[in-house]
C-alpha cells in the first residue's frame, strides 16, 4: 500500500490485494453498505473485470434486524452490486436476540449466514472488509482483556471457518484510503451509527485511538505489533507441535493420544517451556472438552496447580507418585484433568446427571 494513507488505492495496488484469490472458483463478498465493505465490493469488481478468467463474485448483505435502516441499506447495496454486474443476496438473522453480548452474537450469526451463502454459491472464500484500523482496535480490546500471544496476534489474513476460508484482503489498508478511493470514484456508502455507540466496547476504544496516535500508538504501530506477535505465535505453535511428538515418542505409543483421551508423562512434560506446556493443555482440553474453549487464565491456574502437585509428589518420593491415586483432579471446559501414577491424564468429563437420574428408577 501507498505510504500516503489518504490517497486512493491504485489499480496496481488493488490487483495485489486480490492476486492470491485469482484461482478460486467463486468468492462471496460480505458487504453491509458501510465505506469499508462498499470499497471491498468496488475494488473486487474492478479487479475481476481486468481478468480474462476468474472467480464468480457474489455480494451478500446480512440484515441483523437490529436497525430499521438496515433493510434500506441492503437495497442500496443491491443497487450498487447490480450496477457493477454482480449477483446480490440479502440474508436475515431471524429469531430472538440476546439482551447481553449482542455484538458477539451478531458476529457469530453473520459468519454462519455467510458460510451458508458461500456453500450455496460454490465459493471457497468469504471476503470481509476488515482494515488496519479494525486490526488496531482488536489488538487494544484483547490487550485490555489480558490476552496471550495468540490473542494479541489479532486477525489473520486467512482463517478457516465452517469449511470456508475467511479472507481479509484489506487488513493492511487504512480506512482513510478506502474512503479516498470511494470519493474519487464518486461511490456512496452508508453510515452505521452503531459504530459510534458508546454502549459497546469497540466504539469506545475507537474514540481513544486519536489520543493514542498522538503518543505514537497509531493504527499502523498497533497493526505492526500484531504482525510481530503473529510471527512469534507461529513459532511457538511449531514448538508445541514438536513437544507433542516428543511426548508421544517418550510413551512409545503405549499411552492414549487421540479422540478419547490424552496422557503425558509428568516428568517429561515438566521439562518443557511454560508457554508450550500451557498450549499442550489448551489443545487437549479444547479437543476433549464439551463446553467450548478453555479460558487462558484458568489454564494458567491449572498449570500452576499441576506444577505444585508434581513438585509435592517428587518430594514425597517415588512410592507416592506410583500408587495410582490422583494427586490432582479437576474439570475444566467439559474436560477432566488428573495427575496420577506420574502421568497427566485429560479426557472428557462425565456428563452431569439429570434430575431424573438423581431420583433413581
Residue spans for each PLM region:
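Non-catalytic, surface-exposed connector residues within folded enzymatic/regulatory domains
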Residues: 71, 100, 199, 216-219, ...
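Non-catalytic alpha-helical coupling and interface elements of nucleotide-dependent molecular machines
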Residues: 119, 145, 187, 210-217, ...
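Core alpha/beta nucleotide-donor-binding catalytic domains of modification enzymes
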Residues: 2-208
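AMP-forming adenylation/ATP pyrophosphatase catalytic core
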Residues: 2, 6-36, 54-58, 64, ...
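Residues that cap or delimit alpha-helices
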Residues: 174, 212, 273-274
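Mid-to-C-terminal catalytic subdomains of enzymes
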Residues: 181, 185-227, 314, 327-332, ...
Amino acid at each position: 500500500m501507498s505510504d500516503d494513507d489518504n490517497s486512493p488505492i491504485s489499480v496496481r495496488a488493488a490487483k495485489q490485494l486480490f492476486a492470491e484469490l485469482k484461482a478460486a472458483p467463486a468468492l462471496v463478498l460480505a458487504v453491509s453498505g458501510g465505506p469499508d465493505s462498499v470499497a471491498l465490493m468496488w475494488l473486487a469488481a474492478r479487479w475481476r473485470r481486468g481478468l480474462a478468467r476468474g472467480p464468480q463474485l457474489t455480494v451478500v448483505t446480512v440484515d441483523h434486524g437490529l436497525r430499521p435502516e438496515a433493510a434500506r441499506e441492503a437495497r442500496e447495496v443491491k443497487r450498487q452490486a447490480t450496477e457493477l454486474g454482480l449477483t446480490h443476496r440479502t440474508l436475515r438473522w431471524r429469531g430472538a436476540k440476546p439482551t447481553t453480548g449482542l455484538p458477539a452474537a451478531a458476529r457469530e450469526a453473520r459468519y454462519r449466514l455467510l458460510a451458508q451463502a458461500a456453500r450455496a454459491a460454490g465459493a471457497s472464500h468469504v471476503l470481509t472488509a476488515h482494515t488496519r484500523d479494525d486490526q488496531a482496535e482488536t489488538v487494544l480490546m484483547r490487550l485490555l482483556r489480558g490476552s496471550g500471544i495468540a490473542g494479541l496476534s489479532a486477525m489473520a489474513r486467512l482463517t478457516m471457518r465452517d469449511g470456508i476460508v475467511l479472507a481479509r484482503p484489506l487488513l493492511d489498508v487504512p480506512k482513510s484510503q478506502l474512503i479516498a478511493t470511494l470519493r474519487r470514484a464518486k461511490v456512496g456508502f452508508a453510515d452505521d451509527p452503531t459504530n459510534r455507540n458508546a454502549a459497546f466496547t469497540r466504539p469506545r476504544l475507537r474514540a481513544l485511538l486519536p489520543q493514542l496516535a498522538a503518543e505514537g500508538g497509531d493504527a499502523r504501530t498497533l497493526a505492526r505489533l500484531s504482525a510481530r506477535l503473529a510471527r512469534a505465535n507461529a513459532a511457538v505453535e511449531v514448538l508445541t507441535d514438536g513437544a507433542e511428538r516428543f511426548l508421544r515418542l517418550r510413551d512409545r505409543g503405549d499411552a492414549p493420544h487421540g479422540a478419547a483421551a490424552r496422557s503425558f508423562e509428568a516428568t517429561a512434560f515438566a521439562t518443557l517451556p511454560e508457554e508450550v506446556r500451557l498450549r499442550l493443555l489448551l489443545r487437549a482440553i479444547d479437543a476433549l472438552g464439551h463446553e467450548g474453549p478453555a479460558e487462558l487464565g484458568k489454564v494458567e491456574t491449572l498449570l500452576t496447580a499441576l506444577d505444585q502437585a508434581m513438585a509435592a509428589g517428587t518430594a514425597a518420593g517415588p512410592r507416592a507418585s506410583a500408587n495410582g491415586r490422583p494427586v490432582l483432579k479437576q474439570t475444566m471446559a467439559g474436560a477432566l484433568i488428573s495427575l496420577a501414577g506420574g502421568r497427566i491424564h485429560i479426557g472428557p468429563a462425565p456428563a452431569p446427571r439429570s434430575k431424573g437420574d438423581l431420583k433413581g428408577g
